[in-house]
Swiss-Prot record:
Sequence positions that bind Mg(2+): D76, D78, D80
Designated name of the protein: Phosphoribosyl-AMP cyclohydrolase
Pathway this chain belongs to: Amino-acid biosynthesis; L-histidine biosynthesis; L-histidine from 5-phospho-alpha-D-ribose 1-diphosphate: step 3/9
Gene: hisI
Protein family per UniProt: Belongs to the PRA-CH family.
């Protein structure tokens, strides 16, 4: 395993993390991880991230049930970004869409809504 000390966390101790569907390759979300989130992810096999707005560790799907089972972690060539190859339960986006990338640049909805946030949160 790569020594986590060799990863390039930013000045706030964070590293960018992309969640990607293990089967289809679809990009589902972008978030940040601190070292603790990465360690918890490795330890449990369930994606954990760092919430910049709440300033706390969060287990993806903890309140919604829409967890991310991690199959593989990939580190980029600069050691400053991570891809999590995951199986997504339910939707990845808190707005109800399967992917957080559900709009194109024109503002058109191009993604699939898979749950109603009012029923979950």
């Amino acid at each position: 395993m790569i020594d986590l000390d060799t990863l390039k966390f930013d000045g706030n101790g964070l590293i960018g993390a992309i969640a990607q569907d293990n089967r289809t390759g679809e990009v589902l979300m972008f978030a940040f991880m601190n070292r603790e989130a990465l360690e918890k992810t490795i330890e449990t096999g369930i994606a954990h991230y760092w919430s910049r707005s709440r300033q706390k560790l969060w287990k993806k799907g903890e309140s919604s049930g829409h967890m991310q089972k991690v199959h593989e972690l990939l580190i980029d060539c600069d050691m400053d970004a991570i891809i999590l190859k995951i199986s997504q339960e339910g939707g990845a986006c808190h707005t109800g869409y399967r992917s957080c990338f559900y709009r194109n640049i024109e503002g058109d909805v191009v993604g699939e809504k898979v749950f109603d946030p009012a029923d979950v949160y």
